């Protein structure tokens, strides 16, 4: 309880945050770095107001959209689109495991604000947008070995 109180998260925000960490991470070890990226963004909201998590958008298309028969209301899209919405989405996008909850409260101390993942689930972290663009090219090169043109999200 003390760690949650010290985090600045409400219980609901912690559940939402941990669900994103769960979906974005390829392994338990990566959860702590992924958590760090999102903590860094939330802590520097003037420069990085949006989490920009692909998994929140994937949640819309994979789980919400089928119920709306290709006609998702804009308010629903806006509630989960972390490329267009500041801060956390309105709700959790998955059931987080204990490791994701722990990583959400105890992120690694990193300078990173960006990450991208290739099809092999290797994470590439960057401090700047320029580093992120270079990492995207690295991920695309790995993906191309598997016949994938571009990035795979979520």
Labelled PLM ranges:
Residues 1-154:
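Bacterial extracytoplasmic/cell-wall-associated proteins, especially those involved in peptidoglycan
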């Amino acid at each position: 309880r003390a760690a949650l109180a010290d985090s600045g998260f409400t219980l609901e925000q912690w559940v939402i945050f941990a669900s994103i960490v769960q979906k974005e991470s390829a392994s338990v070890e990566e959860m702590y770095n992924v958590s760090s990226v999102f903590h860094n963004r939330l802590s520097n909201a003037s420069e990085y107001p949006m989490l920009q998590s692909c998994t929140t958008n994937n949640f819309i298309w994979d789980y919400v959209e089928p119920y709306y028969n290709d006609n998702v209301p804009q308010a629903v899209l806006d509630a989960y689109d972390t490329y267009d919405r500041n801060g956390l989405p309105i709700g959790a996008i998955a059931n987080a495991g204990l490791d994701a909850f722990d990583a959400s409260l105890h992120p690694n101390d990193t300078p990173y604000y960006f990450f991208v993942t290739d099809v092999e689930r290797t994470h590439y972290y960057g401090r700047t947008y320029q580093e992120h663009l270079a990492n995207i090219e690295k991920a695309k090169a790995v993906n191309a070995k598997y016949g994938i043109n571009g990035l795979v999200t979520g």
